[in-house]
UniProtKB/Swiss-Prot annotation:
Composed of three domains: a modulating N-terminal domain, a DNA-binding domain and a C-terminal ligand-binding domain. GO terms for molecular function: estradiol binding; estrogen response element binding; nuclear estrogen receptor activity; nuclear receptor activity; steroid hormone binding; zinc ion binding. It comes from the Eukaryota. The steroid hormones and their receptors are involved in the regulation of eukaryotic gene expression and affect cellular proliferation and differentiation in target tissues. A zinc finger (NR C4-type) spans 152-172, 188-212. This is Estrogen receptor. The keyword Zinc-finger applies. SUPFAM superfamilies: Glucocorticoid receptor-like (DNA-binding domain), Nuclear receptor ligand-binding domain. It comes from Danio rerio. The lineage of its organism: Eukaryota, Metazoa, Chordata, Craniata, Vertebrata. Keywords: DNA-binding, Lipid-binding, Metal-binding, Nucleus, Receptor, Steroid-binding, Transcription, Transcription regulation, Zinc, Zinc-finger. It is found in: Nucleus.
Amino acid sequence: MYPKEEHSAGGISSSVNYLDGAYEYPNPTQTFGTSSPAEPASVGYYPAPPDPHEEHLQTLGGGSSSPLMFAPSSPQLSPYLSHHGGHHTTPHQVSYYLDSSSSTVYRSSVVSSQQAAVGLCEELCSATDRQELYTGSRAAGGFDSGKETRFCAVCSDYASGYHYGVWSCEGCKAFFKRSIQGHNDYVCPATNQCTIDRNRRKSCQACRLRKCYEVGMMKGGIRKDRGGRSVRRERRRSSNEDRDKSSSDQCSRAGVRTTGPQDKRKKRSGGVVSTLCMSPDQVLLLLLGAEPPAVCSRQKHSRPYTEITMMSLLTNMADKELVHMIAWAKKVPGFQDLSLHDQVQLLESSWLEVLMIGLIWRSIHSPGKLIFAQDLILDRSEGECVEGMAEIFDMLLATVARFRSLKLKLEEFVCLKAIILINSGAFSFCSSPVEPLMDNFMVQCMLDNITDALIYCISKSGASLQLQSRRQAQLLLLLSHIRHMSNKGMEHLYRMKCKNRVPLYDLLLEMLDAQRFQSSGKVQRVWSQSEKNPPSTPTTSSSSSNNSPRGGAAAIQSNGACHSHSPDP
């Protein structure tokens, strides 16, 4: 998606070009136009849909969303990256590695916990920062029209600063940072001559990284004296703690009672009057307005499906829906008042459940069918082509039937979906590797508000109080079934990933790895078993054992606040 902004007397109007899906945005303040899809790049090869998260839509920042593909090869070597030959090789597909010890024919299917959290941080920080950066609508973070405008040496977008030795935009800076910090094996699906510009920089990671090196980006091009965001944040935190301690000591000597950090957080949270003091009908209206647009698959698929075809379709849809799920979450009342750490943790803990309840709602009026998209409708028999998928389809269809029998209303659905998001991180355990939420008080207040909105929806039916209470219990009890299906889907998706049966896109991959670090018990045992028994085909999934078990929250703290960027089973 490539938004174009035009300033007029009435404000900012936007026109959007969607290359990979048909979306309808009902928005009273903006008008969107839709252009025709782009033509294929060449006969027999269709470029991967451009990842919309680097554009004006509030989405996650990451690498290319192009599907994984077997990358056998013995082609030309890059002068900037070392090439490793693989057992499976075909012309015009080159594997690039930043680590000479790597050996694989797949794009790396594992990102570190830090990378996953950084990508999600970039998405959650993207909306306001990007608008300020490119439109200059605000003084803070915007370009000064009186100063010289510089452009990114890699993609020719507006440069946000001097990064890694060259002028570059936030997207290319973050991409290069992830590439040199992670263990990424990029493969060009074409001829290593892809055009890298603002509109196509996401289409090929291998060529984008090659161009980064060509224009002079280097790992050593960092100002050592500045440290990083995490270093500066740690300095500020230490300074604040010292100041608070000093002031506390002075007040204690003077006999004045001081307020602790926890009380300060509660006081700050309680001060968010606009969110916490909303009436149930106001919360309900906001949730209805936050609903994401319908998504189309836009992929050519012919029946009967094979295992790889089916998994490719479903993971492609999941990746597209994740982009819109992030934008939806940011519109949930109170969500953006949370710290970035808490936003990331809630999303990483609930993403598959949120996608599943959306699938259930779309399928509620189609008995025996699962409506993954307007142009992707499947039944149970079609899921049998994938090992273990039929069981998940059965559970989904049974849950759809139960919601259908309850005659679920749209207002109730939006409340249940928001409850899934907020309740996913409401409780933490000492044995969990995930750090607890920073502001449990605020999260609990949000949960209470949304629960009140659900009660308000049910009360409008005019039924007796007993029937209203019973319906509320019936709806909330079904959320445990969705959690169970989510765990099953996570096990299945990771098993398919380890077998290289599925092309994992960057955003989906980040969410899957983050969920892995947060999981325990049966899910963790299944993953461990999968890693101990890798398939005979060389893959990069074994490298996941080198990742730290600390997930999104720890990575957020180590990286600090981020700048703009950004399965269904």
